[in-house]
Amino acid sequence: MEAKWFAREYEAGDESAIGALWRAAFPDDDEVGRTELEYWNWQYRDPPAGFARIRVAVADDRIVGHYAVIPVYMQVRGQVVLGSLSLNTMTHPDCQRQGILTKLASEVYDELGRAGLPITYGFPNENSVGALTKTLGWHYVCALRVYVKPLHADVIADRVLPGGLVRSMAKPLAQLGAALIGRSSSVPEPARNNMRWLERFSSDADELWQAVYNRSKIALTRNADFLNWRYPQNPLRGYRILAYEEQGQLVAYAVLRCMEQFGLRGGMIVDLVGHPTRDDALATVLAAAEEYFRQEDMDLAACLMHGDRRTVQSLRRSGFLPAPGRAFKEWHFCVRLNDSSTDADCIADADRWYVTFGDTDVI
């Protein structure tokens, strides 16, 4: 029997009910703290581009559906645009297949169009892609490539290979291949004096981003305000910021996180930015990141990098290769136009986009 529900805007005081919905919708989520008020405030209230747009569905005095986007500053072919990231979409298990999310999402998109936020992007799971593109006007852009470097060859082989006789026969070769690919990189001794752990980003991150940003691309604006909110201000996740500096100026950086990912202990390079004329600095940052991950006993290092060929080349030179097929999570990237101010062909063009793990909300 379908519950009688109605849609409305988020209201102050809904936070605990939204948390209860999260626990019902995602009972296997093991990231402790995602439903706490401090994290909710950080994710929805405190983004530097403004408060989230949230719609909820209510039935029997409880919240049974939730659709939200957070505003983000983007650069679209050189122009600053206020866009949005779709995240934390959920329906209570008792209220599936009642059109709740279609209703909530459509209302949010209408509001975004009226408010002048033309672009919404997101990373739906494979089961959601069809519904988004067929009924809600989304464009499928591409599957994003993750680059990985094995740090523990035996663990990688156990995870990737099938069981039984096939594993026993193939594992030695797989271990050898992973060991050869995953040879250690080391920081050049003269460059160690340039490496720093940062507590926060300063204005030189803005200058570095403007040097890196290709005006033909679409990308989130990686200025200090955004980076500090996204990483050091996150109350739940322990990011580390590794920087290469010269004469007090930021030349390259990587944001790192150690976590369980793909069924392995993953050293995640969440963001990776280097000055376009300083491949040496970027290589040094990658080597220092690998050293840190090995110290933390990670099984592999992983970096999602799309839209920057130079950085991909640096990853490959450092021993990173594309993750093999479905052995790891696939990242589907989709976008939606909420008004007619932006060219649909432009935003749906995979070659236009610059994307890293830092553009998601889950890494």
What are these regions (language model features)?
Residues 91, 96-111, 279-291:
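Conserved acetyl-CoA-binding loop-helix of GNAT-fold acetyltransferases
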Residues 80-93, 264-276:
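Conserved acetyl-CoA binding element of GNAT-fold acetyltransferases
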Residues 54-56, 62-72, 85, 90, ...:
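Conserved beta-strand in the GNAT
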Residues 1-63, 81-85, 158-225, 266-267, ...:
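Short amphipathic alpha-helix that is part of the acyltransferase structural core
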Residues 2, 118-179, 230-233, 240, ...:
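Active-site/acyl-donor-binding loops of N-acyltransferases
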Residues 43-56, 60, 65, 133, ...:
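A short helix-loop-beta-strand connector motif used in the catalytic cores of GNAT acetyltransferases and
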